[in-house]
């Protein structure tokens, strides 16, 4: 066979192989179309079966592919349904970490907002961290002077719980230097307070749209909770204060449905002071543990019924939970009166557990450092000092700050009771540290059926930043 014949032979064989390969592909495609196109194929080919087990819990999506089943659980919530939130608070033995955002550590090199007053609130499908920005980023010149509480640059924004308050994932909620937010099962409602001290306005948003307003009625820094409001069967409740921070002020409870205010009532509390309430649903009512910035080192308690009737007093426990405060041994509790004669204060929280109470407080008696939560037997109804449990969340070598409450709804947790949760703000920068800015990160804890060991989930950022050295 001469060279030309060899070339022709090899070429013919190659062409034959190519044609054979093409025919195999064509046959494969035809067989696949015929098999997948059949109806009633006994479930052995690609088929999706959707079974709704409970309209408020999940859809079970089963995909069967050549006798191999893949089960994917898809969270499902009927957005036309209100959350109930009339269940009791779960009885818990300790609190386990839920999330930590590490915002300041990340912000040394990332695009993270300068914030204060972070808080958490949950819908039937997710929890979000809300926070008040200063309209500036960490490690940037506009962070200078952000120790100031109220400015036209402050806004309420939110991210999924656990995310840092960063530029790329944050969602705008309202223009605000004081705020609250909650979900009724259908949409988010936010209340953002902004404007001048003497004529501040609270703008109610529902589903992201302004729906109502509350104007300052006392002309002295209208303000609200700085934590989650509370929705029960479609109605949402929150508490507002207008008046002095260091003497008698005025207090109101508001009730809204789909972002429209449908009721309000003044709280009569002569001699007592209410600010920055931390509220949660329990047994069909709203229970709030607040801040007395006037005299008391015990915390005001406000229990709100759906008809806006209320009971107001103080947390009975014989242990103080505000800061600054005196020695535990020298404190005598009261269910009706402020005790301790210490001005100023810090936002805090408590949870009723039957007649017991879980109460959070800074470890330091004089500064916002460290954080612990105590369970006091009969502390909701009596001046008891009996601690049955204590858990450290931030050690006393590290800064803390505000703290507040929220609950996991049964639609989210799958339990038949409301899981009690709390967050602790960890303030960094001015006035305690040598920076030009003030900001914070947070740790979030939720109740569990087990005791949890003490540890310190502190902020951990190394200061000062580059901007502070310029």
From Swiss-Prot:
Its EC number is 3.2.1.18. Disulfide bonds join 90-417, 122-127, 182-229, 231-236, 277-290, 279-288, 316-335, 421-446. Inhibited by the neuraminidase inhibitors zanamivir (Relenza) and oseltamivir (Tamiflu). These drugs interfere with the release of progeny virus from infected cells and are effective against all influenza strains. Resistance to neuraminidase inhibitors is quite rare. It is a single-pass type II membrane protein. Residues 32-86 are annotated as: Hypervariable stalk region. Belongs to the glycosyl hydrolase 34 family. This is Neuraminidase. It comes from Influenza A virus (strain A/Duck/Hokkaido/8/1980 H3N8).
């Amino acid at each position: 066979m001469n060279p030309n014949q060899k070339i022709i032979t090899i070429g013919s064989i190659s062409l034959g192989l190519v044609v054979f390969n093409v025919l195999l592909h064509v046959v494969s495609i035809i067989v696949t179309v015929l098999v997948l196109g059949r109806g009633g194929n006994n479930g052995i080919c690609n088929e999706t079966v959707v079974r709704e087990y409970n309209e408020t819990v999940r859809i079970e999506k089963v995909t069967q592919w050549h006798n191999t089943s893949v089960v994917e659980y898809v969270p499902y919530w009927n957005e036309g349904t209100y959350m109930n939130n009339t269940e009791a608070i779960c009885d818990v033995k300790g609190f386990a970490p839920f999330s930590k955002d590490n915002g300041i550590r990340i912000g040394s090199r990332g695009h993270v907002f300068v914030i204060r007053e972070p808080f958490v609130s949950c819908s039937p499908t997710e929890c979000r961290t809300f926070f008040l920005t200063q309209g500036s980023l960490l490690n940037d010149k506009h962070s200078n002077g952000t120790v100031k509480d109220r400015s036209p640059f402050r806004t309420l924004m939110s991210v999924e719980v656990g995310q840092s308050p960063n530029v790329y994932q944050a969602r705008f909620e309202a223009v605000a230097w004081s705020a609250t937010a909650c979900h009724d099962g259908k949409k988010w409602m936010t209340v953002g307070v902004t404007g001048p001290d003497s004529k501040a306005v609270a703008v109610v948003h529902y589903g992201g749209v302004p729906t109502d307003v509350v104007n300052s009625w006392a002309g002295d820094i209208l303000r609200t909770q700085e934590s989650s409001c509370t929705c029960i069967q479609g109605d949402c409740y929150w508490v507002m204060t207008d008046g002095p921070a260091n003497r008698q002020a005025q207090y109101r409870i508001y009730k809204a449905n789909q972002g429209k205010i449908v009721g309000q009532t003044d709280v009569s509390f002569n001699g007592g002071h209410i600010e920055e309430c931390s509220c949660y649903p329990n047994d069909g009512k709203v229970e709030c543990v607040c801040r007395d910035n006037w005299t008391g080192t015990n915390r005001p308690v406000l229990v709100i019924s759906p008809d806006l009737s209320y009971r107001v007093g103080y947390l009975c426990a014989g242990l103080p939970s505000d800061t600054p405060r005196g020695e535990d041994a020298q404190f005598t509790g009261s269910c009706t009166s402020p005790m301790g004669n210490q001005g100023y204060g810090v936002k805090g929280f408590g949870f009723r557990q039957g007649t017991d109470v879980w109460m959070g407080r800074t470890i330091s008696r004089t500064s916002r450092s460290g954080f612990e939560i105590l369970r006091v037997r009969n502390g909701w109804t009596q001046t008891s000092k009996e601690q049955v449990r204590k858990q450290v969340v931030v050690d006393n070598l590290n800064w803390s700050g505000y703290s507040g409450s929220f609950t996991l709804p049964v639609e989210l947790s799958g339990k038949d009771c409301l899981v009690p949760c709390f967050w602790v703000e960890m303030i960094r920068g001015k006035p305690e540290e040598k920076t030009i800015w003030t900001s914070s990160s947070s740790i979030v804890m939720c109740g569990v059926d087990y005791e949890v060991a003490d540890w310190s989930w502190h902020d951990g950022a190394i200061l000062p930043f580059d901007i502070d050295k310029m």
